Structures are given as structure tokens and as C-alpha cells.
């Protein structure tokens, strides 16, 4: 009896312990048991054992593998049955690359075949997946919700880039919402439609109708798409609402063996470059899956520009597109034309690799060429891009990159540029691209040839220009010739394109030989050195200095912010004598003394143009020439330049002070002030004021000259010495003494006059003495005038009055009335001399033969006064 109790107790313990043991070891035996029903070569793995709670079955982690490839990874799954089956899953990750590794198995005869049979097997179930991830398309992840019954199956998917809501009732599929964000910063593509599914779910819907609305990037108009099909054929039409011609028209047919798009048409009228063409695609054996389908087709592109029409054709296939190893040959041939530019292409290539990471390899003979006109004045004779061996992947471009450019500009000249480099998985800010470049050309306007050469690389986010040398054999413009100017790198230019710590730095040097001027001036060899330091080429600081021999250095610094250039320039104080090489030797001018310094602030921007302001100062300047000297020159130039106009004298007038000018006559204490706008306007005139010169024992004054001029500027002559004037001119025919004054109304923009109604008059007694030889010669040559000439051998002038007019052609008109007393051989007589003279002053100024002209006039116009006064008496002239 005791043995029976023991047996019963052992059986009870076995009944209790075996289920508990199985439950505690689910992670060990469930994968093995499930492998009986899984496809051959696949398995499941549990990193944590499932557990059963009051709420249901919890599976913390489950992986489904095809060989060593993880097809699915499920975490935080729970299965319960409140009113129907409820499956909640935290995350499901699917790797599309593993689908190609699933083994091919024959369908079981007992398996359901029709859609209705499959639907009848569905239990009443809710399935919620918080995060469904498709690799390698992680950006399309979202939340999936399913509500399943045998009558209706509902699906809802919510992601950042895609939203879907639809239901399947029998064979009728209704899509009530499909929103896809196809382009960044653009509204989503929206689609709704109804479809009839086939009786056996082994193909596409047997009929359907769908409409979609989308926005094209950078285009304001909406686009409508409509898809219709019935049985084995259909059509997709895409229309822009503001354009009657379809953007896409694809009629298609499908059979169990082949999918065909025949005579498809497309057009793209946007971006100022209209495109259109035809499309044909054939997919054989499509039902066998992507791995076994054979794809081929043809895409034509028609372009039109000022150079005519262009046609290019892309042929692809036959080949396959595979999730593992695609093999699809491609070839693009033909030409494209836009405006005056023509692009020629012959690009054989091979598309290989997986669809998740494809590789496009250009084959031998791949060449891209172009010619035509890019801008109005630049003609591209030919540009060539050999592409053989170049590979393009998601990681970037790999291979040798070359370019050869031949071009000319009708006025500037022609040039040839070469570029050769090696790319290694290069994309902007990723990978590496090393290059070198060289070239040469002509610069016709300055009768020069130039060359350029350099090296650099783009490695990840860093662009480095390691070598640069470019220059001209000469620059010849007008009267100037610059010998061998050349720009080189003193320090590599490095641009770090890092979002957190960007930088841009480098240093350059512009060196030139002598600058020669046809007049004989020579600027010594010059050097401009400058450096940049900043964030990127649109925001940096710069500084530098310019010097030529002993001239300079002129120091410059500033900044560029991508819109506005700001800076300052300083010319330190230095002797005026350093500019001696700039003085032509023919001038025989010797710069003896003086100091010069200047300071300028400047800015430049597209809207405001170039602006500058500052001042320049010359102190104690002195220059000597064989015939004259200029000493004590002080010049102060405050200025501002904006909107194409100079504003002179911003905080005070432009001032000129010259201590003395020694020439035929000596001028001292020369002063002048200038203030205003140039070019001048009525609202902002230009004023020349306080002009004063001490000369000929008196002075010349002008209070104000206003431009634009409405009134003449009055040039006053005060007590000028006629004897000093005659001594300076040094005529041999006569001599004068005494002072004279006058006023000359000066016009600069009058239609006719330079001086109108000017006058001269004696300020006191004056004397006129004719040279004896001159008087004797006149008497000898003209007996009639001889007696009158004798009265002018010596004359004391008591009153003189001269009216002066000068027109803008240079014609000087003088009308003089002179009254005086002649004293000859102890006799005296009153002389009344009326003098009228016309001569082109420009010609007279060139000849400077005033004395000879006066002698000729005296011969023709001298006359005896009336002899009504007894001999030996002083008589007054009758009025």
C-alpha cells in the first residue's frame, strides 16, 4: 500500500514538474520545435526566455534568421486575449537584403490558394507594432496597426514620411489615405483609390482606379496623377493643372510572363530648360521575383535651344536588378542643347551591386563633351570629361577625374585649362579628391600671355589649395607696362567646412617687376602680400601691405561677410623724395623735400556699390626744375566717395597752401580752398573759395567760384607792377613802370565767354619808354608814322582804361584808351592813344612774341595828336 502511495505521489510530481520545466525552458526547446515547420535554412533565436503572466505571453526578444542573415528582429512582444487576440510589439526590424536568401520551397497541397480561403483562416485579431523599421530604408519607419477579421481587414500606418489607411473587404481594396513626403520641405503626395484584388492572391489587382495630388519642387502649380487599369492593361497619366500637356503618359500591359510599358511619353517644361521624350520598359519573368526578372528599356530625351534640337537616348538592359547582385548594362548616347550650349554624350556603363548599395561603373570609351556659348562673350570651343573607369556609389565618386577646357573671348583672348585628379569615395565633405590643374592663355587687351598651375585636395570636410602660381609675361595698357606680375601662395589656403568649428585661412603674394610709363616714369618692383583668416570664403578677415621699392608700405585690413567688403588702408608718413622714380627724367624735376601720409576707409556691396572716405596730407613739399621752383607746398585732402560721386571737404575744405613759386615771376602765399560735390549738382554745388596769390608786387584774389555757375567768378587784380611784368616777359621793344589793377569776370561753363566785360586801369602814374632801335626802325620803315612814333619814345601815362573780352574759342578782344604826356627832346605834348587789338590768346600764348606784335601794331596805327598847342607850352587835350 505504501508503494502505491509513492507511485501516485511521483506521478503527481511528474505532472507538475514537467510543465513547469517546459515553461522555464521555453528559450531552449521552442526554437528547435519551431524549426520543424520553418522553411529549410531558416531558424528563430531567443536571447531571453518567453514568460507567461496573468496578462498573457511575453516575448522580450526574438530573431528570425536566414542562415547567418537576420531577416527580422522583434523586441518587447506580448500576446493576450481580452476579447480577441491582441498582439503588441515594441519594435520590428526587417532587413530586405535577407529576402534574397530565402530558400525556394514548393507550396503544400493543403495550403490555402484563394484570397477568400486565406481570409477565412484569419482569427479576430488586433496587431500593434510601435516601430516598424525597414532596412536600408530607415527613414520610412512608422507605427503599424492591424484589425483583422475574416470579413474585413483594416490597416493603418503612421510615419514621419508616410501615412497609410485602408481596408480589404472580400476582393475590394479601398485606400482612404496615402500621404508620402517625397521631397524635403514640400507638401506630401496624396493618393486615394479603389482596387479589385484577384481571386488567387498571386498577382496584381485585376482592376482599379487611383488619383493622387502632389507639389513639384520649386514649382507653384499642383500636379494630378490618375491611374486606371482593367485586367491586363492600364494607363498612368500625370498632369500639371496649369499645363494641358501631360507630364507623364504611360500605357502598360501585363501578362504572367511580361510587364511592358510601350510608347510612354514624358515632358518637363520647367526650370527654363524644357525637356520631353519617350519611354519604353520591358520586364520579363516578373512573377519570379526581382532576382529573376529581366529588365530592358529605352528612354529618349529631346531638348531644344538656340543651337537647334538635341536628342539623347538611354538604353538599359537586358539585365537584372537584384537585392544582392544587380547586373544591368546602360548606355547614354546623343546630344542635349540649351540656349547656345551643346552637350555631347557617349557613356557606356554598368549598374552592379545590390539595390540598397548600387555601383555605376563607366566603361572604356565613356566621354562627355560640350561646346557653345555660356555667356554672351565667352565661347566654349570644347570641354571634355573622360569618364572611363569612374565609379559612382552611395559613398561617392571613385576613380580618375579629368577635364580639358578650350575657350575664347572675342575681346579678351583664348585659353586652355587642364584638370586631372583622383577621387576616392568622394562626395562633398566626405572621402578624398586630389587634383592638379594647369593652363595658359592670352590677354589681348593688355598684349599679354598668362599661365596658371596648382594643386589641391578635398579631404572629408577640408579643402586645401596647396600650390598656386599664376601670372602674365607683361601687362601693357595705354602708357603703362607692368613686367611679369605673378600671384603665388605664401601659405596654403585651407577651408575647414566643419559645422561646429569652421575655418578659412591662407596667405598670398602678388609680385611684379618694374612698371614702366612711356613718359619715362618707373615704379620700382612691387609686392602685395596679404592673408585671410575667417570662417569660410563668405566670411573672413584680411590684412596685407603693398610696397614698391622705398614707396610704402601701404597697410590694408578689413573683412568680407559674403555681402559687404569693409576695410581700412594706411599710408604711413614718408618722404616725398621716394617718389622720385615716378618723375620722368625729361621733366628734370627734383623732389627735394616734403612728407606724405594718408588714411582711407572703404566698403563695397552690390546694393550700395563702392564707398570710401578718408584724407591725404602733403606737408612742406618742394620740387625744383631748371626754370622754376615750387617750395612750401601744404595740401590737405579730406574726401568721401559714394554713389559714383566725390564729396570733397567733408569735415573741412580741401586746402592748398604754397609758400612760393619761382618762375619768370615769383608768386608767394598761394592759397585755395575747395569744398562740395563732384560731379556737382544744384543741390550740392562745388565751391572754390579764398583763392589768393601775391604776385608782381600786388595780389590776385578770387572770393568764390561756384559750380554749376550762374554768376561769373570775379578775379581781382590789385596793384600789380607793370615793370615786374615787363621784366618777366622781357620784351626788347619797350619798358613800362607803374601799378595797375582790374577785374576779370570769369566764366567756366558759359556758352560763349571765358571773360566778359573785364577791365584794367592804372592805379597811379605809369610810364612807357620805347626802345631807341625799335623807334628808329619804325621811323625808317614808315615815314608817315615816324613823327607820331617820336612822341611815344617816352610817355607819362596819367590815365589808362582797357576793356577785355575773351571767348571760349580763345579770341581776345582789347579796347584800350590811354592818355598821357609825351616828353621828347625837351618838348612835351599830350598824347591820346586808342588801342584796339584782337588775337587768339591760345596762339599768342604759344608764340610769346608780344613785343614784335606791338611793333607791328605801332607801325600801322600810330598817329600825331592835334597840334593846337604852341611850342614850349603845356596844353590839355580837348575833349
From Swiss-Prot:
It holds the Pfam family YdbH-like. Keywords: Cell inner membrane, Cell membrane, Lipid transport, Membrane, Transmembrane, Transmembrane helix, Transport. It is a single-pass membrane protein. The keyword Membrane applies. The chain crosses the membrane at residues 7-29. Residues 1-6 are cytoplasmic. It is found in: Cell inner membrane. It comes from the Bacteria. Interacts with the outer membrane lipoprotein YnbE. Involved in outer membrane lipid homeostasis. Interacts with the outer membrane lipoprotein YnbE to form a functional protein bridge connecting the inner and outer membranes of the cell. Likely transports phospholipids between the inner membrane and the outer membrane. It would provide a bridge-like structure that protects phospholipids as they travel across the periplasm. This is Probable phospholipid transport protein YdbH. It comes from Escherichia coli (strain K12).
